[in-house]
Amino acid sequence: MAILTAEQVEYTYQTKYQTVYALRGVDCAFESGQMTAIVGTSGSGKTTLLSLLAGLDVPTKGSIRFRGQSTAELDRDGWRLENVSVIYQNFKLFAHLTALENAAYPLYLQKRPKKEAEAEAAAQLAAVGIQPDQFGRCPRMLSGGEQQRVAIARALAAGSELILADEPTGNLDDENSRNIFTILQELAHERQRCVVVVTHDMELAQQTDRVVRIKDGRIAEEE
């Protein structure tokens, strides 16, 4: 059963001369235990759709629904904190925090005791291959692949049901890209998370459970 749905979603924005349709009539559903890739050319609307799914913006028309309820009717900040983790291409780690503190950050926001939060963060860092002697390092002391693993550990520590990733392997070499994709697959299949990934890498996209192709703001194909 779908945990997250887009129903007749339209998203527009205004330029000086015209109304631009970034998305038109988008219908799609996403399930727990499944990894979905959203693909399309630059400007096709795939990142806009991911932002709407994450509750970072609201559709101009139509609705995004989580367990049947429109996200527009929810306290979106509270809903995101409890249910959504977004993994970005540029990692979005805090430069002044250690790997452990970055991974624990969503638990700090949830008011979890510091010791408990950092114990959970340490467990998730270990799960994605970050070694204990790296826990105290700031992001600048980690490689790109290691920083992305910290970002994924942060998503794991948060306990989010929805893991949404925007080009998570875009800055990584082939080996690290495959490793990160494997971790995301394990999140979906072994931890029963709903994982949605925007990617331009068709080879990696074909390894997901489902591929949604967007063209000119519309869903052109699903496979």
Regions found by a protein language model. Name each.
Residues 54:
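Helix-to-loop junction immediately C-terminal to a conserved catalytic motif
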Residues 159:
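Conserved catalytic motifs of ABC-family nucleotide-binding domains
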Residues 138-142, 146:
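Conserved ABC ATPase signature
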Residues 115-133:
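Conserved ABC ATPase "signature" region
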